[in-house]
């Protein structure tokens, strides 16, 4: 389906399946509705190859690459916390931020943004290969051009990020 939004042309695809068994499996394994999505527990103990494939699929579909920043936005905070945990398993530090919905959409859910910046975007780009070609080309540029050796906002000690504790 091709549509124009704010002067931009967007292409979207829809996949429909008619299997009660598959629907029940996906509902139990991945959650229901946008705000109910999550990373299944099995993914956290999976081999790195599986984790890289899951991150590839998620960011190829719902992520974006702009400059040296890789990001994803969701109304499901628990989904992005799971993605953040999977990224940490491959040595990539991510930040999470809550974003209030626009006043134009008073019934919209709170949005959550996961960002990978600094040298962690280079680590991510060197490990995760995207199936979406345009995003992969942008990741290749991060690997080729990024000279960042550490994150300017966070100190590290060995492989531990020393981010501030905001509350307990």
Predicted regions: what they are:
Residues 1-168:
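Internal intein/HINT superfamily modules and their associated LAGLIDADG
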């Amino acid at each position: 389906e091709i549509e124009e939004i704010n002067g931009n042309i967007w292409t979207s695809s829809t996949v429909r399946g008619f299997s009660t068994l598959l629907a029940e499996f996906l509902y139990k394994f991945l959650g229901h509705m946008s705000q109910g999505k999550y990373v299944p527990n099995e993914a956290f103990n999976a081999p790195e190859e599986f984790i890289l494939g899951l991150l590839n699929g998620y960011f190829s579909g719902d992520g974006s690459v702009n400059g040296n920043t890789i990001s994803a936005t969701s109304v499901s905070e628990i989904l992005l916390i799971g993605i953040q945990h999977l990224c940490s398993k491959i040595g990539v530090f991510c930040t999470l931020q809550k974003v209030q919905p626009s006043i134009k959409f008073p019934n919209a859910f709170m949005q959550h943004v996961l960002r990978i910046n600094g040298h962690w975007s280079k680590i991510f780009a060197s490990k995760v290969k995207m199936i979406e070609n345009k995003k992969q080309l942008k990741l290749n540029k991060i690997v080729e051009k990024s000279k960042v050796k550490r994150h300017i906002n966070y100190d590290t000690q060995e492989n531990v990020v020393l981010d501030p504790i905001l509350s307990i």
